[in-house]
Amino acid sequence: MQRQLETRMRVVRTLDRLMQSTPIDKIKVTDLCREADIGRATFYEYFENIYAVATWYYSHLLDQSLYLIGEGVDFQTAHVRLFESLLQDRSFFTRAFRSSDYNSVYNYGNRIIADHYLQIIPQISGKPLSPDEEMHVRLFTAGAAFLTTE
């Protein structure tokens, strides 16, 4: 398990270096593999494509923050943890969030966080969300995603 995490993080760090000179939309798997000193088979064992590197890393941070809401961590604390993590890797996420591809971390984050809130809020509150409340959750997450890119 630790080795898998180390390999994934090496790919994340390599993508970060490559994004310093090339937009994520233009980075090729072969270039990333060469720079990370891994084979293509290893890359595809862990990731589906270049965007999956950024979305995996974002999900990894969500596992340590927002996904803990309702499990002993409150809403504010979870968000502070996430934003502190994003700030620690600000250069990576600033560049990764620039892509508007459907698979980009920006669009992925918006979708996955909205879905998580739509699931967790009724569990915590003990009542289903109304259609208006669901719309408010989606607007909140879209706005938060937009503000994260600023």
Where are these regions (language model features)?
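Arg/Lys-rich, alpha-helical DNA-contact motif
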Residues: 77, 91-92, 121
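An amphipathic alpha-helix adjacent to DNA-recognition modules
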Residues: 5-16, 25-29, 34-37, 44-70, ...
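Amphipathic alpha-helical packing segments from all-alpha helical-bundle domains
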Residues: 81, 102-127, 131-146
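Amphipathic alpha-helical segments within well-ordered protein domains
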Residues: 66, 94, 148-149
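Basic/polar phosphate-binding segments, predominantly the helix-turn-helix DNA-binding elements
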Residues: 4, 32-53, 85-88, 92-96, ...
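Amphipathic alpha-helical interface segments
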Residues: 14, 18, 143-150
